[in-house]
Design a protein with these regions (language model features):
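Conserved two-metal-ion catalytic palm core of "right-hand" nucleic acid polymerases
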Residues: 1-174
Length: 174
């Protein structure tokens, strides 16, 4: 997989356009990251190169020693509920989003055409294909041939709280 400074720059511009995540209101940090996209992307890429130059064992040790600041926030969920959201430090949000864009770019050709979530293909400042959305997913699902059979059922679930329920120890040891 190829990672470049451009991946981090694109992440900074996307954060500046859309905010840090889809559960929190737009924060002034996002505009600051966008305005300093070149500076921050350079810092992120320098860090990436330093980690990438280490052996796998040393890189894992280095990353495991990092402290990534985060806040746990109660955010509205629907019209009558709340959920816990984790907001990581803006720098780490940018760094991880840059790596995410590099991974997505490398993997996009392998993804099913039936997938609708966060597909690359947009132009700056939003790099995601806005024609792929929750709404288009639901419309495509309702148009499925299999649903025309008598007794067909659609089961809809919400996995937005999955992070709270996974066993993190296994993830830490991957």
């Amino acid at each position: 997989m190829h990672v470049s400074q451009d991946h981090f720059r694109r992440a900074a511009l996307e954060i500046g356009q859309s905010g840090e995540n889809d559960t929190l209101p737009y924060d002034i940090d996002a505009a600051f990251i966008r305005d300093r996209a070149e500076d921050f992307s350079g810092i992120c890429f320098t860090l990436f190169k330093a980690i990438d130059a280490k052996s796998r064992k040393d890189a894992a040790g280095y990353v495991n020693e990092l402290t990534i600041g985060a806040e746990r926030l109660l955010t509205p969920s629907g019209s009558h509920g709340f959920r816990i959201t984790t907001r990581i430090h803006p720098f780490w949000n940018l760094y991880l989003n840059g790596l995410g864009i590099a991974i997505a770019e490398a993997n996009e050709g392998n993804r099913s055409q039936r997938a609708h979530s966060y597909r690359l293909g947009g132009e700056a400042p939003s790099y995601f294909d806005r024609k792929r959305s929750w709404r288009t997913y639901k419309e495509a699902t309702l148009a499925e041939e299999a649903l025309k059979a008598p007794g067909s059922v659609i089961v809809q679930t919400d996995i937005s709280s999955f992070y709270e329920h996974i066993y993190h120890h296994r993830l830490e040891n991957v």
